[in-house]
């Protein structure tokens, strides 16, 4: 099989391409390197560099057996600084990918949604535009009869995660702070809870969605079903590194909790996520 991965130079995309190659597939990546790195290129995959809005220009009428659409402007806080770019990548880019698939009769798209869907979309440009991206996918599914599956991610961490303070998740940011002998910064009171899901499990979920012919009327929820407070995570870091903690003011769009409750991916796809958080911190 031949698959296209948008966002293939990013954290999740790179891990996904590794899995697809190990499964014996051909892989093409399209990435604009806004958060991904050219250093993440893997042998035996083909790489193109541009935004997904220009997918038709970059890839022409190439045929694929499926598209994993991961390419997006990620993270809540940067979306307040550049809402227009977030709209272009997350809405216009998603429409372009769906239209490319329709015109080239590509059988399936798996779209990377977000658990922010479960909070008020108006809380941030990121949440709103990921929500609209899902609606674009549903439009193409319902109007054109396409197989467009939505996979909602819950707080992904693991090997290759960004340590950039702007684009990284809390684990990546804290890793950077620890390496510089700085206190780890806790936003707000630290009692906000997150369903931390290892990238290995996210990739396995994505592949199960793509490889199976099982369709979901809404979205596949990819989370462990267990959440930790940020304070609990901070205690793991303190126990591992002996670092200090520093509380900073809360931020816009910082929702109180994420937790996967829907069991469809587990029950219908046989997906088996594991709680790997403490093991991951211990092995840093």
Name each region found by the language model.
Residues 97, 137, 174, 265-266:
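Structural element of the ATP-grasp superfamily
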Residues 65, 77, 84, 95, ...:
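Residues in well-ordered alpha-helical elements
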Residues 39-41, 161-165, 233-235, 258-259:
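Short aromatic-enriched loop/helix-cap "lid" or pocket-rim segments at secondary-structure transitions
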Residues 12, 86, 129, 170, ...:
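Hydrophobic alpha-helical packing elements
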Residues 178-284:
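C-terminal substrate-binding subdomain of Rossmann-fold SDR/epimerase-dehydratase oxidoreductases
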Residues 39, 77, 175-176, 212:
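Short secondary-structure boundary/capping segments
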Residues 1-156, 256, 271:
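N-terminal Rossmann-like NAD(P)+-binding domain of SDR-like oxidoreductases, especially those catalyzing
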Residues 125-127, 131, 135-194, 199-208, ...:
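NAD(P)-dependent short-chain dehydrogenase/reductase
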